Regions:
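Sec-dependent N-terminal signal peptides
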Residues: 6-13
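C-terminal motif of bacterial Sec signal peptides marking the signal peptidase cleavage site
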Residues: 15-19
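Short, compositionally biased
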Residues: 127-142
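Second-shell loop/turn segments in exported
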Residues: 55-62
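Mature extracytoplasmic domains of secretory-pathway proteins
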Residues: 68-119
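N-terminal, intrinsically disordered, polar/charged segments of Gram-positive cell-envelope systems
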Residues: 24-49
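Positively charged n-region of N-terminal signal peptides that target proteins for export
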Residues: 1-4
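Well-ordered alpha/beta subsegment
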Residues: 138-163
Length: 163
């Protein structure tokens, strides 16, 4: 009777370990699939561009790969985003996005052409430099005419995806 109990217990343990092992292998396979999907998404984001139109001038910007930018891309995929932007301190234009995005703020020193998220719901475009805690959105590729387009006072900027 004791031998039968030990044999049954051994069979249950072997079957249990086998089930755990196959589940583990399945999880590794699923993980590899998820990783490859995330890599494809990341590769797409590192080459994704948006257009910033101010008046009759358009500028292309290379986008960062972060949660805020992915959320912004989703918004732009639905329709272009138009933001009224005011001058602030003679080095940036600031405007409300109308909703909050996920932030990943880091202390950075901006340069002309940088586009960042401030306070989760403010888009800031720089034509000067500033040090503050921002979430990077993107950077204008060619600054020719950038400062002139931003000019003095308020502007309306239209953000859209580049196809």
């Amino acid at each position: 009777m004791k031998k039968l109990f030990v044999i049954c217990l051994a069979l249950v343990l072997v079957m249990g370990f086998t089930a755990c092992e196959s589940t583990s292998q399945l999880s590794e396979s699923e993980t590899a699939s998820i990783d490859s999907n995330n890599t494809a998404e990341t590769e797409d984001m590192t080459t994704m561009k948006m257009s910033v139109t101010i008046g009759d001038q358009s500028f292309n910007a290379t986008l960062e790969d972060n949660a805020a930018t992915r959320e912004l891309v989703k918004m732009m995929g639905e329709e272009p985003i138009s933001i009224n932007m005011d001058d602030y301190s003679g080095f940036e234009k600031v405007g409300s996005l109308g909703r909050s995005l996920t932030t990943d703020n880091k202390q950075i020193t901006t340069q002309p052409g940088d586009i960042v998220l401030y306070s989760g719901n403010q888009i800031v475009m720089f034509y000067g430099s500033n040090s503050w805690s921002y979430t990077r959105i993107g950077k204008i590729d060619d600054l020719s005419g950038w400062e002139d387009a931003l000019g003095n006072g308020s502007v309306t900027a239209v953000f859209s995806l580049v196809e």
